[in-house]
């Protein structure tokens, strides 16, 4: 009998990639692709094997319709963001229907809400799998892989870098970016949970994908919230992230601060970023914030004036940068009684990469691999789980291969 898998928010770029790549895994699946605009899914259905997928209109805030859709499913995958608004109603419906749930949530607040439902999920006899994307997601698995090389764990850096994807990034992604560039940042320092200001502390790491040693920013992400549950004796756990080229970070910080301080609304901030990504002029209010952010970045020596001028000049004539991105996990601790470290990172990025061609590719492919694992392990666990709680590294890497990823692209160790 076919196993019925529901995708909610299926028309989103990352979810589309997850569907395409999951379809490469062998299995008797029935895919139901739900979206508030199902007409956007027709070309996706045509790409899939005939009869594999059907489409359905769904407003996830229509509680009765949502419940009817998820009832009887073997797995529900939420791809609609921002998760701070979308995850709670879908998880509630899955608990009611007693069906497994999986998402690629990258917001702290909604991740913590899902974790608070651990006992309810156990009572319902279902798993709630959160953060099953790139970062969080594959990044957490890389941490476990690196940590397994050591005897003790003291410091963990989860690192992500996203390249130039102009034109065209979804509004939910842009809203998330503004959310992590200004405001509070829950993190783990001196062996306890503390609050920092996001996008202030910096660090560098030897990223793959052609990036090399590059500066990134501490970001408000779920990894420092979930990983201490597995590594409670660690002294420092942080998430470092950023965009390439570097001036994108100053621009985002400036607009994020303007939104955080009430000088722009969230909609105005997202509208401005969307205009820039699509080579439109953007608002004067947005440019004031963006320039302020980039100048501040130069003054702090986080980037150079020449890099800012080059970025603005290229942007003015519609030129973009070659895509460079990646994930990296760096763990310090001890081995055989001596200080030691271990690094795991993705290998390549850009147009000729399957896994790290862009943000949608890495997130969607990782999500597809987590889905394969979750379906392979149906009935094995109940409760709420972050990736480090259940996805064994080698099993995850094999799942990435099952959804089409060349083994040589998946992971490498760095001395």
Pin down the residues of each PLM region.
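Conserved glycine-rich Rossmann-like NAD(P)H-binding loop of the short-chain dehydrogenase/reductase
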Residues: 27-37
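Helix N-cap at the beta1-alpha1 junction of Rossmann-like dinucleotide-binding domains, i.e.
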Residues: 12, 37-39, 108
């Amino acid at each position: 009998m076919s196993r019925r898998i529901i995708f909610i928010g299926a028309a989103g770029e990352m979810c589309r990639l997850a569907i395409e790549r999951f379809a490469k895994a062998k299995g008797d699946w029935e895919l139901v692709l739900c979206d508030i605009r199902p007409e956007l899914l027709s070309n996706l259905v045509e790409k899939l094997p005939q009869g594999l997928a059907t489409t359905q209109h769904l407003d996830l805030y229509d509680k009765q319709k949502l419940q009817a859709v998820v009832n009887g499913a073997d797995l529900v995958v939420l791809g609609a963001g921002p998760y701070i608004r979308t995850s709670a109603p879908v998880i509630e419906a899955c608990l009611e229907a007693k069906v497994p749930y999986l998402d690629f949530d990258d917001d702290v607040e909604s991740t913590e809400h899902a974790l608070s439902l651990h006992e309810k999920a156990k009572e319902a006899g279902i798993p709630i799998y959160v953060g099953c994307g790139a970062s969080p997601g594959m990044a957490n698995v890389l941490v476990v892989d690196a940590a397994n090389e050591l005897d003790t764990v003291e410091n963990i850096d989860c690192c992500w870098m996203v390249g130039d994807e102009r034109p065209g990034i979804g509004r939910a992604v842009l809203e998330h970016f503004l959310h992590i560039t200004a405001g509070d940042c829950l993190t783990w320092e001196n062996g306890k949970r503390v609050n920092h200001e996001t996008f202030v502390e910096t660090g560098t790491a030897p990223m793959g994908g052609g990036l090399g040693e590059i500066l990134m920013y501490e970001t408000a992400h779920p990894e420092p919230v979930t990983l201490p549950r597995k590594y409670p004796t660690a002294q420092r756990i942080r998430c470092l992230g950023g965009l390439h080229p570097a001036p994108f970070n100053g621009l985002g910080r400036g607009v994020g601060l303007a939104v955080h301080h009430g000088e722009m609304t969230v909609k105005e901030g997202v509208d401005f970023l969307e205009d820039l990504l699509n080579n439109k002029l953007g608002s004067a209010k947005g440019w004031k914030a963006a320039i302020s952010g980039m100048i501040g970045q130069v003054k702090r020596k986080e980037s150079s004036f020449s890099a800012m001028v080059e970025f603005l000049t290229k942007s003015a004539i519609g030129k973009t940068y070659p895509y460079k991105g990646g994930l990296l996990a760096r763990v310090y601790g001890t081995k055989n009684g001596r200080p030691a470290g271990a690094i795991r990172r993705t290998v390549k990025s850009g147009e000729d990469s399957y896994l790290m061609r862009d943000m949608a590719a890495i997130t969607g492919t990782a999500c597809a691999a987590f889905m394969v694992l979750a379906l392979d392990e149906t009935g094995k666990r109940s409760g709420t789980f972050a990736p480090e709680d259940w996805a064994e590294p080698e099993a995850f890497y094999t799942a990435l291969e099952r959804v089409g990823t060349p083994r040589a692209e998946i992971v490498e160790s760095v001395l």
